[in-house]
Amino acid sequence: MERKQILNLSLWIVALLIINTIWANVAANEASQQLNDQGFEFQPERQVSLKAVFGSDAELPIAITTEFIHRDDPSRSANASWRLIDASNEVVLNWAGSTNEPATLKAELPPGEYTLNTTIDENVIAIQHLDITPFAPIATLGHVLLSLLLVAIAFGESATRNFIAKRIEQTEIKESLSLIHI
């Protein structure tokens, strides 16, 4: 292979690695939603909407992180619990415990509307966050499509270069033939 061809092929391979690395980072990103937090009014019932990207109906990886702290005395223990209920009123996730027990529950749930019901004793602060990884279900498809698109661009670029080179060569031949006939 010519040195120029090796360099060109190497650059396309580097581009393929860069595209897939960027997509891997995008697909791993989480969208965080504050459900209840310190300094905000506590809402015992929160609507939670899980939306898929690009019309996918695949289950979305989620994580609900909760922490309950007693307002008067952080070392004091009080009861706390929460339930995540889907549109058909079925409990899909739940947790029960006491204050000062931070917990993170992970699950994969289908897109849809959910309700988070939280029950706490008086003078308890609820800190609840929902993290969704919306691109995770289509991560593999994204890698395949982006890789195929990059390969198509690489072959298209190569074909375009060859086409232009042939056109220039044909034009030069026609010009040299017309000069000979003059």
Kindly give the residue locations of the regions a language model identified.
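Hydrophobic secretory-pathway targeting helix
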Residues: 1-35
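Membrane-proximal low-complexity regions enriched in glycine and acidic/polar residues
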Residues: 25-86
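Conserved small/polar residues in nucleotide/adenosyl-binding loops
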Residues: 180-182
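Short tyrosine-centred short linear motifs in exposed loops/low-complexity segments
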Residues: 56-62, 110-114, 120, 124
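Selective detector of the "anchor" transmembrane alpha-helix that sits immediately C-terminal
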Residues: 139-163
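Extracytoplasmic/lumenal ectodomains and periplasmic regions of secretory and membrane proteins
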Residues: 71-119
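Short, aromatic-rich amphipathic segments at membrane interfaces
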Residues: 116-144
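Short, highly charged, low-complexity non-transmembrane loops/tails of multi-pass membrane proteins
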Residues: 168-178
